[in-house]
């Protein structure tokens, strides 16, 4: 999803893509371990094993990092629903509800901390229309 807050160059190298993902993974881990209030650019950079300048290259601001996390969360929601819908045969209108039910049954298992991150995103950014746009579009 393209967002004015989040930028990934069209021709990004594999190293740049991996570095960007390691920053997102570090930010997610900070939220899971310490809460969203502990997330700073410096903390994300340190946890990712890079300099703050390298972090700022990929995310120009904390808000840009937050926007990327929101986008990644929305992508996670889409992939999880699709994965659970695929367990059932039939057209989408027949697999959607059973897919949701199966997803909710397994919600506490193997979600890699996404429920904690999702809760933090919803509770902290609920009134931020621009930041929450990817999630609201998913719902």
Language model: regions and residue ranges:
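N-terminal intrinsically disordered/low-complexity leader segments
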Residues: 1-18
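Active-site oxyanion-binding pockets that recognize sulfate/phosphate
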Residues: 13, 63, 128-132
């Amino acid at each position: 999803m393209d967002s004015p807050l989040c930028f990934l160059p069209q021709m990004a190298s594999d190293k740049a893509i991996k570095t960007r993902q390691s920053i997102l993974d570090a930010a997610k881990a900070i939220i899971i371990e310490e809460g969203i209030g502990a997330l700073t650019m410096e903390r994300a950079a340190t946890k990712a094993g890079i300099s703050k300048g390298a972090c700022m290259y990929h995310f120009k601001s904390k808000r840009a990092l937050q926007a990327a996390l929101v986008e990644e969360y929305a992508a996670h929601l889409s992939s999880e629903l699709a994965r659970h819908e695929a367990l059932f045969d039939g057209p989408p209108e027949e697999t959607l509800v059973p897919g949701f039910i199966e997803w909710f049954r397994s919600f506490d298992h193997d979600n890699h901390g996404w429920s904690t991150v999702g809760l933090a995103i919803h509770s902290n950014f609920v009134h931020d229309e621009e930041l929450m746009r990817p999630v609201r579009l998913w719902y």
